[in-house]
Structures are given as structure tokens and as C-alpha cells.
Swiss-Prot record:
One of its GO terms (biological process) is arginyl-tRNA aminoacylation. Its EC number is 6.1.1.19. A motif ('HIGH' region) lies at residues 124-134. HAMAP family: Arg_tRNA_synth. One of its GO terms (cellular component) is cytoplasm. This is Arginine--tRNA ligase. The lineage of its organism: Archaea, Methanobacteriati, Methanobacteriota, Stenosarchaea group, Halobacteria. It is found in: Cytoplasm. NCBIfam families: argS. Disulfide bonds: none annotated. It catalyses: tRNA(Arg) + L-arginine + ATP = L-arginyl-tRNA(Arg) + AMP + diphosphate.
Length: 602
């Protein structure tokens, strides 16, 4: 409804400006400031004041007088507030919003666009446990994929596996070279990546500390592995594959805890084995931007504003990561309409070089999008696993669950619902709230901004946190359960002697809402699909987190001012129950976009 209302506002305002012989290229339609009573506003008067030769408030009044609201489904009235032109919907807007949202558990999802998108995210090198500093990638990437699905795209989630670089050659050599007795200490966890990472650390330490002759011999073995991969040697692929698949299996278990799941794990060696990497290198050599310098083939990308050359082939004819990634991206373009990649800020140059080179090769890079993120820090400072130190994602999730469990148990006496929570219930809530707190705190920030993760903020039930917004959903569920127990019809379900049955839409009247709190909440419900559309267009899932906080504020005001089950007015009570159902669906789906559980009780 909000999307249609916005479209009607644009049409009406455009017609008004045209009738005044004023430009219509920038309508300035936006959400009004919080202290302004309007659903949409236009700041166009600021832009036109100079052209008209009058003060913005006077221009706004002239424009408002020229707006004709006749013939629109939702646009009903126009007025001004200083320099702003304000637009107001009629009753049908609220009626249709309540009808659509109260009975549709999938409310907010947009129609199918018949457009395929591949979202590549996480793609951490399979060299050991997932480090907490990289936790932003799977969390943001999963939210981007969810968001695009809600926006009507056909989405595949991919993890690009770096199984061809030097790190994996070193890992494979170390795994074959050393025995358990050579390793220091026990694995930090009983899982494959924690076990095998000890070989990787041992190998790197050996290469730094062993005598020069031993290191030279080791480097020859490592080089042979790399050459074997380039030559397509099946035995080498099997040797490397054993290490990669074992470590990756453990990493999958960690990521499943978030959860972050994938449709396909695409291996880098795939594009060496099928010849596409060689094809990329050959095509690049033929371009006017290719030069052979410093014993390597390079691309000069000055025409794209990039000072640093892209090295795409070494002197021994071995390819580099970016060369293989170019083949990978052309494969994406062959199989999907769009491609989105979530990358850490240290890959920004690589992303720019990739875009420029893909364009040089004749690809339409408008089909490619990047989400660049900064890293997650703990209060102690930046973390690194280069030496095998630091906090792992598993550690963060464990502590989140423990802290959430403690918070839930502390708040047991403050619960409004009179149901008894079992130990299993407490454990379930601890997982939903704890992991939700981590995900929400990370995804709620603009990706480009660095994060310092603070427990006090992430688990604050009264603050701008996951528990704060999750509690809205739990409250909705509690009210709807109470209504059903009292024999009150609930949109979608009602209680009878046989249990719970589907009853579809109810006969409720949204025009009976007499308080601003109810109308304001319904306005928030109405704009959810538009929030999905805008966030998907900009690849900004953090704006949905902002929506949940604003929605929670609106719901809590309604909760304080509008009794639902205890209302004496039957018609008003039915409408409020429907509004609670609409709020439940809206919050559940907003949280689903963010990958955060929506608890039924807390």
C-alpha cells in the first residue's frame, strides 16, 4: 500500500508542477521528520524557491494548491508545514493495509521479478576456524541474500573456495609432512578445522624458523603442488582436496550455527581444470593494456582510475587468484542475471581491478554489485589469526548464548505471560536471543563502518538491540494466544474444540482505530514492503534493522495505550487483534531478512 501511495504522490506532484510550468525532474519525496503529521512529504519547494523567486513556504503553498487528489485510491489530502508539501492517505489505505498484513504470514515479500541473482559471501580461506573478525561477512552476506529473496529475486548463495593458492599448497605440504607428535597442544575444539589448523600453523612456523636448506627443500615441494594444480594433475587435486574438504566441513558446522547456509561451494580449481582461466589469460594478453614487466604479465588500469597494475600471470605461466576469479565471474554472468559479492575492506582494490578488467573483457559490469564491509573488533582492539591467536566465531557464539541464558534467567520474575518455561524453553530462548544479538548488532551497522562489539549493547533488552525488537514479536504472540484462549477470533487461526484451524481473513474495520498510536503502527506496517524494496535496491540490509527499531517504538506505544483482549468494544477489539497479527507478521519477516529468530516467548 505504501508503495502505491508513494507512486500516487509522485504522479500527483508531478502533474501539479507541470501545470505550474515548473521542472519535474526532482520531486524531493521523502519520509517527513518525526514531528510532522504526514505519511510522505516533499521538499521540492527548497529547490524551486530560487527559480520562482519566492520563499520556500510560499512556494510549497502554491504547489499544494495545484495538487489534485481526485481519482487516486489512497492519496486523499495535501497540506503544508512550512516549506514542506505534506501528503495524507485516506481510510482505504489503512483498511487495505490491515486486510493484507493481518492474514498473510509472508507479508512484506514482493512479487517475483523473474531475475536470478547469485550472492557470494564468506568465502574464507579453508585454513582453519572462522575468526570473529570475519564474522561480518556471513552475517551481512546472508542478510543480503535474504533481502533479495524478499524483494522477489531468485537467489543462490555461493561460497567461493580458495583451494588453489599458496596457502592451500603450504597447508597440504604441512599436513603430509608432519605427524600428530610434531604438533603443539590439543585442538581447541573437537572439530576438523580446529584439528587440522595445527598443521597449518606448524608449517608456517617451520618455514619461518627452520634452517635455510630445509626451508628451500620445503619451498620446492610447495611449488610442486602449485605446479601440479596448474598442470591439471589429478593426484595433486586429490591431495589438496582432502585437506580443503576436511577443513571446510568443520567451517560449515560453525557457519550453520548462525545459521549461514549455501546452495553451492564453488571451488577455485574448477576454473583451472575447465580451461577458462587459461582463456582469460590469453585474452588479456591480447589487449592494449597488457604489459610484461617485472617477470609477470600485468594490466595497466590507469584508464579506470586505478594506479596499481593487475598482475594476472607469473613468469612461470602460473595464474593468480584474481585471474581465476575473473573466470569465476564470467561463469556467474553466464548463469545468472546479476551477481553480488560481499567483501572485506582489504579487498576493495581487488574489487575495483576486477570490475575494470571484466569491463575490458567486454562484460556488462552493471550486473555486478559489491558490498564492502569493515571488520569486527572486540573492545581489546583489532584481532588477528596470522599467528593462530585471537577469538573465533565459535567463541563469540558460545559466550552470546551463555550471556543470553543468564539474562533470561534473571528476568524470569518480570515476565508478563503466566506460562511456565521449562529448561528446554530457556535454552531455546538463550540460543535465539544470544545468536540473534550477535547477528543483529553486526548487521544493524552500515557495512563500511568499523564495529566494536559490546556485550552490554548487544544484549540490552531495553536498548536498540535484538532482544528489544524480538520482544515485540514475543508480545504479539502472547496477545494472540491470549485472544485465542478467550475465544476471540485471530486472523489466520482461531481456537475451537478440535484445536486450531485456519479461518482466513476476518471481518474487521480499520476505520475504528481512534488513537494515534494504532494509526502510527499501521503506517509502519504499511511501509514495510517499501522498506524491503529500497533496501534491496541499495543492498543495505542495515536499513531493515533500522526499520525494526522504529517499528518496535511504534508497537510499544500501541501496547501501552491500546488494550487488546480486555477491550469492551467488540469491533475495536477485533481490529486491534488484527493489528497485533499484522505487527507479528511484519516483525517476524523483518527479523527473517536479518537472519534473526523471532521468539514466540521470552
Amino acid at each position: 500500500m505504501f508503495r502505491q501511495f508513494r507512486s500516487e504522490v509522485a504522479d500527483a506532484l508531478g502533474d501539479a508542477l507541470a501545470s505550474l510550468d515548473l521542472p519535474t525532474d526532482d520531486l524531493g519525496i521523502e519520509r517527513p521528520p518525526d514531528d510532522m503529521d504526514a505519511t510522505l512529504a516533499s521538499s521540492v519547494a527548497f529547490r524551486l524557491a530560487g527559480e520562482v523567486g519566492d520563499a520556500p513556504p510560499n512556494v510549497a503553498a502554491t504547489v499544494a494548491d495545484a495538487v489534485d487528489v481526485d481519482g487516486y485510491d489512497y492519496l486523499a489530502a495535501v497540506d503544508t508545514a512550512g516549506p514542506y508539501v505534506n501528503f495524507h492517505p485516506g481510510e482505504r489505505y489503512f483498511v487495505d493495509t490491515l486486510d493484507a498484513s493481518a492474514v498473510d504470514s509472508g507479508y512484506g515479500a514482493l512479487p517475483d521479478r523473474d531475475t536470478s541473482v547469485v550472492v557470494e559471501h564468506t568465502s574464507a580461506n579453508p585454513t582453519g576456524p572462522v575468526h570473529v573478525g570475519r564474522a561480518r561477512n556471513p552475517i551481512v552476506g546472508d542478510a543480503v541474500a535474504n533481502l533479495l529473496e524478499y524483494a522477489g529475486y531468485d537467489v543462490d548463495r555461493h561460497y567461493y573456495v580458495n583451494d588453489a593458492g599458496r596457502q592451500m599448497a603450504v597447508f597440504t605440504w604441512a599436513y603430509e609432512r608432519f605427524d600428530e607428535s610434531d604438533l603443539a597442544g590439543e585442538p581447541a575444539r573437537a572439530r576438523a578445522e580446529y584439528d587440522l589448523v595445527r598443521y597449518y600453523r606448524k608449517g608456517n612456523a617451520y618455514l619461518e624458523e627452520a634452517d635455510p636448506e630445509a626451508v628451500e627443500a620445503a619451498e620446492e615441494e610447495i611449488a610442486a603442488i602449485l605446479q601440479g594444480l596448474e598442470a591439471g594433475d589429478e593426484e595433486t587435486y586429490e591431495r589438496v582436496g582432502e585437506v580443503v574438504d576436511t577443513v571446510l566441513g568443520g567451517m560449515k558446522e560453525c557457519l550453520a550455527r548462525l545459521p549461514a547456509e549455501f546452495d553451492e561451494f564453488v571451488k577455485e580449481t574448477r576454473f583451472m581444470r575447465d580451461g577458462s582461466t587459461d582463456d582469460i589469460a590469453a585474452r588479456l594478453k591480447e589487449t592494449d593494456h597488457a604489459v610484461y614487466e617485472e617477470d609477470a604479465w600485468q594490466l595497466e588500469l590507469d584508464d579506470w582510475g586505478i594506479d596499481k597494475n593487475l598482475v594476472f600471470l607469473r613468469s612461470d605461466d602460473t595464474s593468480l587468484y584474481t585471474t581465476r576469479d575473473l573466470a569465476h565471474h564470467e561463469w556467474k554472468f553466464d548463469n545468472y542475471d546479476r551477481a553480488v559479492t560481499v567483501l572485506g575492506e582489504d579487498h576493495k582494490l581487488q574489487a575495483d581491478q576486477l570490475d575494470a578488467t571484466l569491463e575490458l573483457l567486454g562484460n556488462d559490469i552493471d550486473r555486478l554489485g559489491h558490498v564492502i564491509y569493515s571488520y569486527v573488533n572486540l573492545p581489546d582492539g583489532k584481532m588477528s589469526t596470522r599467528r593462530g591467536t585471537g577469538v573465533m566465531l565459535d567463541d563469540l557464539l558460545d559466550e552470546a548464548i551463555d550471556r543470553a541464558r543468564e539474562a533470561v534467567e534473571t528476568r524470569m520474575d518480570d515476565r508478563i505471560r503466566d506460562d511456565d518455561l521449562t529448561e528446554e524453553d530457556v535454552e531455546r530462548i538463550a540460543h535465539e536471543v544470544g545468536i540473534g544479538a550477535v547477528r543483529y548488532d553486526i548487521v544493524s551497522k552500515q557495512p563500511a563502518k568499523a564495529i566494536t562489539f559490546e556485550w552490554e549493547d548487544a544484549l540490552d533488552f531495553e536498548g536498540q538491540s535484538a532482544p528489544f525488537v524480538q520482544y515485540v514479536h514475543a508480545r504479539c504472540c502472547g496477545i494472540l494466544d491470549e485472544a485465542a484462549d478467550a475465544g476471540i477470533e485471530v486472523p489466520g487461526v482461531t481456537a475451537d474444540s478440535e484445536g486450531v484451524v485456519d479461518v482466513g481473513a476476518l471481518d474487521v474495520d480499520a476505520t475504528v482505530f481512534e488513537t494515534d498510536a494504532a494509526r502510527d503502527l499501521l503506517r509502519e506496517v504499511a511501509r514495510f514492503p517499501a522498506a524491503i524494496e529500497s533496501a534491496a535496491d541499495d543492498l543495505e540490509p542495515h536499513t531493515i534493522a533500522t526499520f525494526t527499531r522504529e517499528f518496535a517504538d511504534a508497537y510499544n506505544a500501541f501496547y501501552r495505550e491500546c488494550p487488546v483482549v480486555t477491550s469492551d468494544d467488540e469491533e475495536l477489539r477485533a481490529a486491534r487483534v488484527a493489528l497485533v497479527a499484522a505487527a507479528k507478521h511484519t516483525m517476524a519477516n523483518a527479523l527473517d531478512v536479518l537472519g534473526v529468530e523471532a521468539p514466540e516467548s521470552m
